[in-house]
A protein has these predicted regions:
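Non-catalytic, solvent-exposed segments at the cell envelope interface
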Residues: 2-345
Length: 345
């Protein structure tokens, strides 16, 4: 083989490795709720299929009878704009501990990520759960949670990615941990779960278990809230951790085999391989500092509904604004009437 042939073969191999790294980083990243998930793809001339495809390869755009169109057949979607539901489960109860909606507008080159507080109030009469908190809908499976999110916010969910927290720990450990600026005093002990969280504000080196502890903390031993704004502060910390992890993943491409093993063992998604590959080109053009916007749905976390305490009642006006600004795939703006924001009267 001549020098030119060897050089071309080497370049092709390098490109395959690069794309594979971006793919793993993307899904691994979504491993706790975030952006790199965008690195999956289908085929350039084909659009990704919807959540109802059960990971089958689709060679054409979803039809107008697919779930994402059934919800609102009269509203037009932006071209090549897709929504993803990212979920991490609660280790003790099986409920969803982290719920995020990520929307990737591949034409505009923008990503919006919105966290839905786990205690967000929902109407039990809607049929997704008898308990009035959205995290409980995950007990019936990812499709049920997806339906609850669509019912709540009025937007379709095209794809899902669920993460096992053991995978998150393994991922952090595979890159040697992270250096993170702990935002608040953390002191919590739960012998039943063998959970002990003790950190002080400032730059701290965290291994996988430590990082998970920081992500999980809500209250301190003395009964005070870890964050003055409760779950808003907690999800803000989670988002910052994910960005930190994403950057370090990209700095360690030589660990690709470990990333693949972790993804295979701990991540579940309905993204087909072809869908995943389609997203690579638009994802490669993203600027992680400028093209990604994050927010947490605002509300009141002190609401009680029947026997459920500390429900998180969403602020209607602010919720509609955030959804329209960051994650709606529709051309025209949604209104409060398009959503199902339950409130205690």
């Amino acid at each position: 083989m001549g020098k030119v042939g060897k050089r071309q073969k080497k370049m092709a191999l390098r490109r395959i490795v690069q794309y594979t790294i971006f793919l793993i980083v993307f899904i691994v990243l979504s491993m706790f709720l975030l952006l790199n998930l965008i690195k999956s793809e289908p085929i350039v001339e084909d659009n990704p299929s919807s959540i109802a495809t059960n990971s089958e390869d689709i060679k054409s755009e979803p039809t107008d009878t697919s779930p994402e169109f059934v919800h609102n057949q009269t509203r037009l979607r932006k071209d090549k704009c897709y929504t993803f539901l990212i979920v991490a489960s609660d280790q003790s109860s099986g409920n969803a501990d982290t719920i995020m909606v990520l929307t990737f507008d591949t034409v505009a080159g923008k990503v919006g990520i919105v966290s839905i507080p786990r205690d967000t109030l929902i109407n039990p009469e809607d049929g997704y759960s008898t308990y009035p908190k959205i995290n409980s809908t995950y007990l019936k499976g990812i499709d049920n949670l997806s339906g609850a999110v669509t019912n709540l916010l009025g937007i379709p969910i095209d794809f899902f990615i669920t993460i096992n927290t053991k995978g998150f720990v393994a991922l952090i450990d595979s890159i040697g941990g992270i250096d993170f600026d702990i935002p608040v005093h953390m002191s919590y002990d739960d012998p039943v779960q063998n959970l002990y969280i003790h950190f002080e504000p400032g730059i701290t080196h965290l291994n996988g278990e430590d990082t998970l502890k920081v992500c999980r903390l809500r209250d301190n031993n003395d009964g005070t809230l870890a964050y003055p704004d409760y779950d808003i502060g907690r999800t803000r910390t989670q988002q910052k951790i994910l960005i930190t992890v994403a950057k370090k993943l990209l700095q360690n491409p030589q660990k690709i085999n470990e990333y693949i093993d972790i993804f295979t063992q701990y991540v579940h998604t309905n993204l087909s391989f072809r869908n995943t590959i389609w997203f690579i080109n638009p994802a490669l053009s993203l600027n992680l500092e400028q093209d990604i916007s994050t927010a947490t749905l605002p509300g009141d976390g002190t609401v009680s509904y029947k026997k459920a305490r500390y429900c998180y009642e969403l602020d209607p006006e602010e919720t509609v604004k955030i959804v329209n600004d960051l994650i709606s795939p529709y051309i025209t703006a949604l209104s409060i009437d398009d959503m199902n924001l339950f409130a205690v009267e």
